[in-house]
Amino acid sequence: MGVEIWLPLERWKDQRCFRLRYKVEPEPRPFLTLQPVKVSPDPEWDPRWEEWHCYLIPLTIDIQDYQQLLAGCFDRVFHTKDPIDGWPMDSLDLCSPNWLGEEDWRTILTAIRGEMGEASRRKRKFYDTFLRWLEAALTHTSIIVAEGNQ
C-alpha cells in the first residue's frame, strides 16, 4: 500500500509543505503555494476551502524565485478561464487563489522544459524538481490552486 496523498478534510493542518528554493533568503518571505484540489465528480460541486488544502505535500516557492524563474512560463497560460466557473483570468494574482486546470499546467510544463536547455545547472535542478512535483500532482488532480500570500 502506498502513501495516501489526500488528507481527511478536517486534517488540513497536517499538510507538509515542500519548500522549493533557488535563492536562500531569510524567513519570512512572500511565497506562492501550489495546492492540488481534491476534485469531485458532482456536477454541482462548489469546492470548499478544505478541498484545496488537503493534499499531503503542497509546493511552496518564494515569490522572488517565482518572479525570476517561473513567471514567464506562467504568463503563457493567460488569458485563461477558471476551470470551475469559467471566470476569465488575465494574470496570476499573487494576493488571492488562482484556479488553473490541467491544460494550463501542461502549457506551463512545456514552457519550463523549453527554459531548461539554456539554464545553468542550478536552475535546471530547480526546474527539474518543480516539474517532478507538478507531474506527480497532476496524476492525482486536474486542478491546482496557485495562491500567494502578498
What kind of feature is each model-predicted range?
Residues 1-142, 148-150:
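Acidic (Asp/Glu-rich) sequence patches and key acidic residues
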